[in-house]
Curated annotation (Swiss-Prot):
Belongs to the IRC19 family. The lineage of its organism: Eukaryota, Fungi, Dikarya, Ascomycota, Saccharomycotina. Involved in sporulation and maintenance of the mitochondrial DNA. Is probably involved in a pathway contributing to genomic integrity. This is Increased recombination centers protein 19. Transmembrane segments: none annotated. One of its GO terms (biological process) is mitotic recombination. It comes from Candida glabrata (strain ATCC 2001 / BCRC 20586 / JCM 3761 / NBRC 0622 / NRRL Y-65 / CBS 138) (Yeast). The keyword DNA repair does not apply.
């Protein structure tokens, strides 16, 4: 075991500080889906995502937000409807590559490579970028959840089921059935979250993921 700076402990398997417990070898968290049925694949991939939970953050609130997000993705999300908000048509068939790429992305976000080690520099920076994106995604998910817990709010349905907050962002989508809130604050919130969610979908489309 090696101590790296104040509050940081480095072991063969992980680097632990006040914010993260980052893993060094992510291979055991990857998924070999050979011979698995679709149902088995979904269960196995879900377990892999949940096993990464301790490495997302040392803060219980962040870990709980991560678990809530993964649960929503697997149990409730209408992904084709969500993608349609950016004009991308896809069916509801299981795309294993998207799930595996998403798992790899989260694993990178939870892994550590010393940026000072020559050829590993770009890989380390890639991992850092994944970690920053995941952090932002979970922050936005937490904030949206906070808004949906308020009384008399329709935002839960908008954020998780209708995705109407992205309609004004994507001008090609007809938004006649959607009236933005009269409150400037609520309208701004919807615009900000709509822009972020749209960017995540564009990233998914670019990297063949399903975040």
């Amino acid at each position: 075991m090696v101590r790296r700076g104040v509050g940081t402990i480095e072991t063969v398997n992980a680097l632990v500080n006040d914010n993260y417990a980052l893993i060094r070898n992510v291979a055991k968290y990857m998924l070999n889906d050979k011979g698995l049925t679709n149902a088995e694949f979904l269960r196995a991939s879900y377990r892999r995502f949940i096993r990464l939970r301790p490495f997302v953050s040392n803060r219980s609130m962040v870990k709980d937000t991560y678990t809530d997000y993964i649960r929503y993705k697997y149990r409730y999300e209408d992904y084709p409807k969500r993608m349609a908000m950016i004009g991308v048509q896809c069916d509801n068939q299981l795309n294993r590559s998207q799930v595996k790429n998403s798992l790899s992305f989260v694993a990178k976000a939870c892994s550590f490579i010393d940026e000072s080690k020559g050829t590993k520099f770009e890989v380390a920076r890639d991992n850092t970028m994944c970690r920053q994106i995941l952090k932002n995604l979970l922050t936005i998910h937490y904030e949206k959840t906070s808004h949906t817990n308020e009384k008399r709010t329709p935002l839960r349905h908008i954020f998780q089921y209708s995705f109407e907050h992205m309609k004004d962002i994507n001008k090609s989508t007809n938004s006649q059935s959607y009236s933005k809130p009269a409150s400037p604050k609520s309208s701004l919130i919807l615009d900000l979250y709509g822009e972020f969610d749209r960017d995540i979908l564009l990233l998914n489309n670019l990297l063949n993921m399903r975040l």
